[in-house]
């Protein structure tokens, strides 16, 4: 007698279990990636906030520092993800690839939108800063929510919710305190997530 096809819930459970097992076996857990992003956000946005409070550092220097740190984080994330994906086949690989494409497509789309709004010239430089920081933190939160649902990861889902709250807070506090929110709330959220995932990996918890 043929086996009955799995339900959607059973399929998601299987994908989540396989993903956790692969991460443990291949050393591609999220702790290292989150730590890289925590470093980029804490140092990058922290330096940018400091630069706005002193006249000795040109404003563009903060942008360069953030860009360099983010390129590092993106490169490291790609390396860890590729290493973790070696030898993986089936639903887990497909879901992981689609999730990665979602990040890329969303980032490109949001960049086009923010650039176009900025080009209208109706916003001040302070408001442009709030636009970019708020929308990007919001996008990060939404995609982490999606990842948490896909892999049934409550910590990832909670991190996404925290990022969304931080996005709203960064706009409410205004410029230049929004950079401080990005550093403390955004970077701090990544750091806390990295620590929790690291403890889980060491203890073998799912």
Feature map (PLM): residue ranges:
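N-terminal juxtamembrane cytosolic/stromal segments of multi-pass membrane proteins
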Residues: 1-30
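C-terminal ends of transmembrane helices
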Residues: 21, 75-93, 142-149, 194-198
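Selected alpha-helical membrane-embedding segments in polytopic membrane proteins
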Residues: 27-116
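Hydrophobic alpha-helical transmembrane segments of multipass integral membrane proteins
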Residues: 35-42, 46, 71-74, 104, ...
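Membrane-helix interface and helix-disruption motif detector
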Residues: 54-60, 120-128, 173-181
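Alpha-helical transmembrane segments of polytopic membrane proteins
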Residues: 62-70, 130-134, 183-185
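Membrane-proximal helix-loop-helix units in multi-pass membrane proteins
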Residues: 105-156
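Terminal transmembrane helical module of multi-pass membrane proteins
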Residues: 140-206
């Amino acid at each position: 007698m043929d086996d009955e096809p799995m339900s959607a819930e059973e399929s998601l459970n299987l994908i989540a279990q396989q993903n956790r097992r692969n991460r443990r076996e291949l050393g591609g857990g999220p702790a290292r990636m989150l730590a890289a992003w925590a470093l980029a956000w804490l140092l990058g946005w922290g330096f940018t906030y400091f630069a706005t409070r002193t006249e000795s550092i040109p404003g563009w220097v903060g942008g360069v520092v953030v860009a360099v740190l983010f390129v590092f984080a993106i490169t490291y994330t790609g390396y860890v993800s590729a290493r973790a994906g070696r030898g993986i086949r089936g639903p887990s690989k497909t879901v992981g690839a689609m999730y990665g494409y979602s990040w890329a497509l969303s980032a490109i789309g949001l960049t086009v939108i923010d650039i176009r709004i900025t080009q209208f010239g109706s916003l001040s430089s302070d408001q442009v800063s709030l636009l970019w920081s708020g929308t990007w933190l919001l996008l990060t939160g939404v995609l982490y929510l999606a990842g948490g649902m896909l892999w049934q990861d409550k910590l990832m889902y909670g991190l996404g919710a925290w990022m969304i709250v931080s996005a709203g807070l960064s706009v409410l506090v205004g410029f230049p305190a929004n950079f401080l929110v990005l550093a403390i709330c955004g970077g701090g959220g990544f750091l806390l997530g990295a620590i929790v995932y690291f403890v889980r990996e060491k203890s073998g918890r799912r």
